[in-house]
Amino acid sequence: FLGIVAVLIIIFLIWQFTTTLVVIFALASIFYTLTSLYKLVAGYSALEHRYLIDTSPEALDLMDERTLPMYTILVPLFREAAVIPYLVQGINSLDYPKTKLDVRLLCEEEDDETYQAIIDQDLPPHFNPIIVPASDPQTKPKACNYGLQGAKGEYVVIYDAEDRPDPAQLKKAVLMFDNVDESIVCIQAKLNFFNQQTNFLTRWFSIEYSMLFDLVLPGLDARKDPIPLGGTSNHIKLKELVEVGAWDPYNVTEDADLGVRLHQAGYRTTMMN
C-alpha cells in the first residue's frame, strides 16, 4: 500500500508539482493539528485523573516481604561496558528481597567488551549473564524475547543499561498489581532524565518527557485508551506477555507496539505514580 502511495505521489509531483506540494502540506498540517488536539484532550483528562492505589512509603512498609513474588528483570545490553558498574549498583539498590530477583543481563554474542565488564563485576547469584546468539534481526526486542526463556518471575520488567530506577519501584508495582482489576496486566512507571539540569538539551528532553509521562500517558490511562509503552520500566505479567507473543523483534518501536497489542487482546495498561 505504501509503495502505491509513493508511486502516486511521484506521478502527481511530475504532473502538478506545486498543487501536489500544497495538498501534501495541507494534509500534514491537518494531521498534526488533530494529534495536537488529541494530546490536549489527554492532558486535560490527566488533570482530573487520580491514582487510587496508595504507594506511599508507609503503605510499602506494611508489605510482607515473605509473600512477594519472583521478579524477572531483563536488561538488554549492546556496547555498554562503561556503565555496567552503575547498572549493577542501581539494580542492587532496589528494595526487594534478592532471593526473589531473577536479573538477566542480555549481552549480544559479538559484544565481548560488555560481557567481560559483566564478568569483572563478580556478580551475586541473582544476576544471570546471558549471551544472545548472533542472528537476524539484532534488536533489543529479539534480545528480550530470548531472555524470557526460562524466566522465573511472575512479573517482568525491562531496564536499560543507563537507568536509575526508584529503589521502591518493584514493590510499588506488586502493590498495584495486587489491588487493581485483573484486566490490568502492565504498569508503566513514569520516566524522566536524572541529569535534567546539565544543559539546555537535557532540559528540553526533560520537558518533552514530562509532557508525555506526566500528562499524555496518564490522560490515556484515565480514558482507558491504549498506552504506548516507554522502552523501560514497564512491568508486565509474564503469563499474559507470553500469551500476546511478547515483543515483535522486527519492530523498532516494540514498546509502543506491545502496549497496543495488549489493548487489542482485551488487557489494560495503567501508570505508576
Q: Positions of the model-derived regions?
A:
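N-terminal signal-anchor transmembrane helix
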Residues: 37-73, 78-100
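Catalytic donor-sugar/metal-binding loop of nucleotide-sugar-dependent glycosyltransferases
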Residues: 250, 259-273
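Acidic donor-binding segment of Leloir-type glycosyltransferases
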Residues: 92-136, 178
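N-terminal membrane-anchoring/stem segments of glycan-assembly enzymes
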Residues: 1-65
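Long helical/loop segments within the catalytic core of UDP-sugar-dependent glycosyltransferases
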Residues: 120-154, 167-252, 263
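Short acidic donor-binding/metal-coordinating loop in glycosyltransferase active sites
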Residues: 161-163, 254
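Cell-envelope/extracellular polymer assembly enzymes that use nucleotide-activated donors
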Residues: 69-72, 102, 242, 257
